[in-house]
Amino acid sequence: MSRLAECTISDTVDELVQRAKLAEQAERYDDMAGACKTMAKMRNELNNEEANLLSVAYKNVVGARRSSWRIMSSIAKKQAGTPLAHQHDIYLKKVEEELIQICNDVLALPVLPITEKIGAEAKIFYYKMMGDYYRYSAEVQEGEQNDKSTEAAEEANQKATSLAEAELSVTHPIRLGLALNFSVFYYEIKNMPEKACSLAKAAFDAAITEVDSIKDETYKDSTLIMQLLRDNLTLWNSECETDS
């Protein structure tokens, strides 16, 4: 199984931050995640820059495996019953194991579980991260393991949503990103398109009324996520109307 390269504990946090940035520029995301993982072990709480580096690193690392899994899963289905079926199943299992290990690595980081000491925005950020990585696990799991990951993902997203609705503006990119990912969870994992549409539409409609008040530094991120919400609603709309 592939393992992420980790840095030594003798590296300072500043050195690890710089190493993560360098790895990001080189698009070496396994190296970036290794630096961020070591950094997270050295800190009780990450600042915004460190948390964002951690998020970007693992998003790309797990994203590559999710893409591989989808490709291999499609190939395995087409090859079912052929002489190559067993070989494809073995390779698919290897990708699944890598993906789940990465998710477990994230969920085992010292910044999770979430403590009362950190601020509301950080709590929302980490609960959202928990929800995402439990969802990624559920995508490839079956049976009891799938049920456990699905339940954990929903619980983390619900906690993040309750906090976000109380603490963040409707145009805040973290709140919008949470709504985007939670709606995808309902659509893809829970197979509840009507719930997914309702959540995505509520987030988009609330944000569009306040679009003129978005701060300059978050305008690009917020409007991009709003566009993704609208794209999903367009894609899901026929199913939502059928289920209504």
UniProtKB/Swiss-Prot annotation:
* Signal peptide segment: none
Q: Which domain of life is it from?
A: Eukaryota
What InterPro entries does UniProt report for this protein, alphabetically? 14-3-3, 14-3-3_CS, 14-3-3_dom_sf, 14-3-3_domain
Instruction: Enumerate the Pfam families for this protein.
Output: 14-3-3 (PF00244)
Q: Which Gene3D superfamilies match?
A: 14-3-3 domain
Which SMART domains does this UniProt record tie to the protein?
14_3_3
Family annotation (PANTHER family): 14-3-3 PROTEIN (PTHR18860)
Q: Belongs to which family?
A: Belongs to the 14-3-3 family.
Q: What is this protein called?
A: 14-3-3 protein homolog 1
Specify the species: Echinococcus granulosus (Hydatid tapeworm)
